[in-house]
């Protein structure tokens, strides 16, 4: 069962959460408009591959840690992540402030990506999705509320 809302009011408009959701949705719609082979190329190019990260360290492969957070593998993958970000992100953004929240979001995504890379260092399967960053937001919500 998916939650639809929480009962904690906020004092500020969650502009960072809204922007992250809008960016992810726009990128997914772009992915959806592509041919299968083109979408596969995008995921292969911009998804984070642990093996590449360790074998060929460099700016391009480090960039994929962040670019992978905006790609999603399907409609339910996107909806699940964005729903949880919408419900819980607004309270964390309100508590932290916009700039700190954005940094926190990316640090959570970075920590999740590096954790995955350390567990599966030989994997050349692209890791995509905002799940790691959103999990960090959800964890902080559980700690605060």
Give the role of each language-model region.
Residues 1-145:
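A detector for small-residue-rich transmembrane helices and their helix-helix packing motifs
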